[in-house]
Amino acid sequence: MCGSLVAMAMTRQLITLADGRTLDFFVSGDDGAPLVVDLPGTPEGHRLLPSLEEAAATTGVRIAALARPGYADSTRLPGRTVADVVPDVLAMADVLGVQQFAVMGTSGGGPHALACGALAGDRCVAVAVVSSVGPWAAEGLDFLDGMGEGNEVEFGAALEGEKQLRKLLVLWREEILAAGEQGTLASLQSVLSPPDQKVMTGEFARHMHESFQLALENGVDGWGDDDLAFTRPWGFDLARLGVPVFLWQGEQDLMVPPAHGRWLAEAVPNCRARLLPEDGHLTMLLNRPAEILADLAAELHGQD
């Protein structure tokens, strides 16, 4: 999976925000390189995949992966909306000494990346959304249609409210962490399409389990708050997106069905969509980082 290149050294940073919260992020790459902000999925940790870190080095960008509030050591922000991630991203960029950046969001990170494109002004120059969910109540999109059983159960609990959702997620967290890699695999089984089943082995399976461990080490706050935010208004208008948006969607995705990608491709201005018939959800994380980052790198280098 890692190829022959040596990845840049990855460092973890914790900063204190103006409101007193802690923000947790990883950074990899040269300080002077253009910055890509990585917003992971739900409920993924923010430690960079080796394939993503390597792709960043190849394309000449620095990458910073942010743990949203409630994940890892980032302090919870109760009742947060999707849009609430934007001030955190800007604060992280300020600490890193970066004025302009691009944003990549995968799966549950996708809406948050779009929020940056809509609300961060001229500081965000481009967005990539990979296997991103669409808005819950969007006209013309049946959010749950085509999703695997696990996702249907999860969002069904979210609609019943925070108490019921938390009860479910606490149980799932215990099962995942207690059973190791096999627990992670079992938790994903109902949403793994054939292409994703093929890659959920070996080093990648270990990374995914460690990612879940990192995200959930302090509880399920981030996971639950993500789910609740997805079932509510996102807090911004997609029509406000004026930056280039690169959309990647696998046609064999059971976590986020391709209808979400097609809907976003129509709804988002300046969207350049790639709908890939052979890909699922996890295959995008493993096999496509270099292509995804190449789009963003071109936009960032164009700002020089």
In which residue ranges do the predicted regions lie?
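Conserved hydrolase catalytic core segment
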Residues: 100-142
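Conserved HGGG/HGGXW glycine-rich cap/lid loop of the alpha/beta-hydrolase fold
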Residues: 21-73
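N-terminal cap/lid segment of alpha/beta-hydrolase-fold proteins
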Residues: 6-27
